[in-house]
Regions:
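N-terminal catalytic cores of secreted or lumenal carbohydrate-active enzymes
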Residues: 1-97, 109-111
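Glycine-rich phosphate-binding loop at the start of an alpha helix
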Residues: 100
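Active-site helix-to-loop segments that bind/position phosphate- or nucleotide-bearing substrates
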Residues: 106
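Short, surface-exposed connector motifs at secondary-structure boundaries
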Residues: 111-119
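Residue-level detector of conserved catalytic or cofactor/ligand-binding positions
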Residues: 119-128
Length: 129
């Protein structure tokens, strides 16, 4: 029996983790620059998923505001997939309410750019009742 395999190019982007925010920020700028160039050079490259978060766009455009139109084109073309959250889901968000608000803000931000991806990894260690 033949099996079909899907490969989803994506990031797992922590704004800060083992380096200072500024160091991660510059790595993000490099990643986004490389992605936008890849979208232009390789029409066969299908898409890249920004890890379910939209704050990446704010962080990138803070350094490269002149790339706004290219980012918009990539999102509109379905090459750059965004949302549905604002920040990366985290076990340590304060409460379930924080996670819901994170999604609501992320959906609102995503819709400003286009259609959000209705898929994300969610891992919450809070016990169910």
């Amino acid at each position: 029996m033949k099996k079909k395999v899907y490969i989803i190019s994506h990031s797992h982007w922590d704004r800060e983790w083992y380096m200072a925010y500024e160091q991660h920020h510059m790595r993000l700028v490099e990643l986004m620059d490389d992605l936008l160039e890849l979208f232009e050079k390789d029409p066969e490259f299908n898409s890249f998923h920004l890890d379910g978060q939209t704050i990446i766009l704010d962080d990138y455009l803070q350094v490269r505001p002149e790339k706004r139109e290219l980012v918009q084109q990539a999102i509109t073309a379905g090459k750059l997939r965004i949302g549905p959250f604002y920040i990366l889901q985290d076990d340590f968000l304060i409460s379930s309410e924080s996670n819901v608000r994170n999604m609501l803000i992320g959906m609102e931000e995503s819709q400003k750019w286009g259609t959000p991806v209705m898929l994300s990894l969610i891992h919450i260690s809070e016990p169910t009742r």
